[in-house]
Amino acid sequence: MSFVGGGADCSANSNAIAQFNKHTQQDRSLQRQAANQQGIVQNGQGFKKDSMMNERERQNMDQFMNNGPSQSNFQFQPMRHELNMIQQNHKQPNVQNNWTNEFQTNSPSPVQRNTPLAKTGSPANAQWATEFQQPMDQTFNQSNQQQFNNMPNMRMGGYRPMMGMSMMGGGMHQQQNQMQHQEQNQDHQVDWDNQFKEIEQLTNETKDAEAEQVKGEEEPEIVIDDKYQATFQEVWDSLNSEEVENDFINQQYEEFKNTQRDSMPADMAQWEKDFAKYASTRAHFGDYQFEDNQHNQFLDLPKESDPYEIGLQLMENGAKLSEAALAFEAAIQRNEGHINAWLKLGEVQTQNEKEIAGISALEKCLELHPENSEALMTLAISYINEGYDNAAFATLERWISTKYPQVADQARQQNPAIDDEDRFSLNKRVTELFLNAAQLSPNSANMDPDVQMGLGVLFYANEDFDKTIDCFKAALSIKPDDAVLWNRLGASLANSNRSEEAVDAYFKALELKPTFVRARYNLGVSCINIGCYKEAAEHLLSGLSMHQVEGVQTDASSTLNHNQSTSLTETLKRAFIALDRRDLLEKVKPDMDINQFRGEFSF
């Protein structure tokens, strides 16, 4: 029996149909996977359709089906002829890019070069191949950014190609082609790092060009709302007006020094001359502005009723400070020389967070009674609050000269004239006076709390808050029920970044005097500093509500505007901004209705 052309299964009783059936039932999944195309196996079978056979092929088929075993079970010549025809009709396209030429030279694909199978593919693969064959420069210029951004979890510098597969050609070859490529082309290695570096360099150049183009474009004009323009203009005008005012004050001070230097009486004490010189550095706050008659019900009291006494009773009973202020105003309007009424009016207005009105009243009190120690101490603290340090130091020196004349006279004998206008020198000199006064009563039982108060103010001006706190605590050991001292201690603690302790001091002051508006204002500021914005707003609204007097209606033309507190409203705006409540911020304005906030805040 001959094995030549006999096939793998030869026997005496061999049946060609059975052999053919067995042959066609063999597992050819690898071959089908390698082809994976529709050009050769259009209908998933190995034969052409009858309509596609020529006459010779049909005769061979009939002869094969009708006759017994032939000398050769299979005739592959016609099929080989067809494959050669397909190869001739599908020539490889000319590649126009150097990168792809190098790619084909270094890593030739056996399927592409030796068989026509790789040239026949699905429409998707054919479209991809067409895009691949376009010039690389054109491709990157058009869509390089989009292509690289769409690569998930891949970085150009850290990518290593697997099994020799190009990142750009992952859809062309299947697993069998990759295995053949690895087996037959191990000697050809592609320098992928250089290829990707070139691509990355090209991409970076494109990005730089786009960045330059964007940078060169003109930025769009920013349109600012008219409301913010008006606000900016208002702030700018206020700054300019403040600068003009400061220049005017400095000019007045220079004129005062030139004209008043030789005009002081010869018998005037040196401390009085210094006070006149340094106190003039402050702004002139003008005369006190009284409320309109229609807004002050105490003006209508019968003559036998004393508005001054009523004001004292209101303060003692915990009434609103604004009501007590109206009573003292009525007493002054009855008698403009009422020294105590001016003093109490100044103290009430400073505690009511109306500093300017309080300063005007205290200055009037000192004009009537220059040696009033209570007015001097309160006025010095108000000057510190407003930033007139030299005027405050001169006022404190006047307080020492009034209450402890022996200390001031001894200092004047050692240094008769003071020509240095430096605030630090003035502070040092006045501090030495207060220290000398404190040494007169070293025993804590006989300690003068006002001396400790003055020392605390001097240390406060130098921002030595630790010493300030010690002085105020020493004063509180003598006067533990003084709400004003507790408030000043709280302010010192707050300025030394001890806001929690400051809150406790403010609460103590409010416990002693619930209508103490300045303590409520300071408490609101401390709440803002520790992030309690809603509580801060409630304290500030409570302070503003205490400025209102029952039965008194205010309007924009009322002189009440002269004695309103801007610090309360401005700090309330800060609290609303911190709460991100722009809707409430727009409601904060002079003569606003406080009751509109009661729905959200408790005060």
Swiss-Prot record:
Where does the record say this protein resides? Cytoplasm, Cytosol; Peroxisome matrix
Cross-link Glycyl cysteine thioester (Cys-Gly) (interchain with G-Cter in ubiquitin), sequence positions:
C10
Q: Which UniProt keyword terms apply here?
A: Cytoplasm, Isopeptide bond, Peroxisome, Protein transport, Repeat, Thioester bond, TPR repeat, Translocation, Transport, Ubl conjugation
Map out region (Amphipathic helix 2 (AH2)) in residue numbers. 58-76
Short sequence motif named WxxxF/Y motif 4, residue ranges: 271-275
Q: Where is the composition biased (Polar residues)?
A: 31-45
Spans of TPR repeats, please give.
Answer: 304-338, 339-372, 449-482, 484-516, 518-550
Alphabetical list of Pfam families matching this protein: TPR_1
Chain span(s) of sequence motif WxxxF/Y motif 3: 192-196
Please give the InterPro entries that the UniProt record associates with this protein: PEX5/PEX5L, TPR-like_helical_dom_sf, TPR_rpt
Motif (WxxxF/Y motif 1) spans which residues? 99-103
Q: Region Amphipathic helix 4 (AH4): what ranges?
A: 232-248
Any one Gene Ontology MF annotation carried by this entry is: peroxisome matrix targeting signal-1 binding
- SUPFAM superfamilies, per database record: TPR-like (SSF48452)
Question: Cross-referenced SMART domains, in alphabetical order?
Answer: TPR
Biological processes per GO annotation: protein import into peroxisome matrix, docking
Q: Its GO CC terms? A: cytosol; peroxisomal matrix; peroxisomal membrane
Give the start-end ranges of region Disordered. 23-49
**Region described as Amphipathic helix 1 (AH1): spans on this chain:** 11-33
- Which region is the signal sequence? none
Q: What post-translational events are described?
A: Monoubiquitinated at Cys-10 by PEX2 during PEX5 passage through the retrotranslocation channel: monoubiquitination acts as a signal for PEX5 extraction and is required for proper export from peroxisomes and recycling. When PEX5 recycling is compromised, polyubiquitinated at Lys-22 by PEX10 during its passage through the retrotranslocation channel, leading to its degradation.
**What is the first-listed, main subcellular location in coarse terms?**
cytoplasm
Q: What is known of its domains?
A: The TPR repeats mediate interaction with proteins containing a C-terminal PTS1-type tripeptide peroxisomal targeting signal (SKL-type).
The text of the family note is: Belongs to the peroxisomal targeting signal receptor family.
Tell me, what does this protein do in biology? Receptor that mediates peroxisomal import of proteins containing a C-terminal PTS1-type tripeptide peroxisomal targeting signal (SKL-type). Binds to cargo proteins containing a PTS1 peroxisomal targeting signal in the cytosol, and translocates them into the peroxisome matrix by passing through the PEX13-PEX14 docking complex along with cargo proteins. PEX5 receptor is then retrotranslocated into the cytosol, leading to release of bound cargo in the peroxisome matrix, and reset for a subsequent peroxisome import cycle.
In its UniProt entry, what is this protein called?
Peroxisomal targeting signal receptor
Q: Which organism is it from?
A: Debaryomyces hansenii (strain ATCC 36239 / CBS 767 / BCRC 21394 / JCM 1990 / NBRC 0083 / IGC 2968) (Yeast)
What taxonomic ancestry is recorded? Eukaryota, Fungi, Dikarya, Ascomycota, Saccharomycotina
Q: What gene makes this protein? A: PEX5
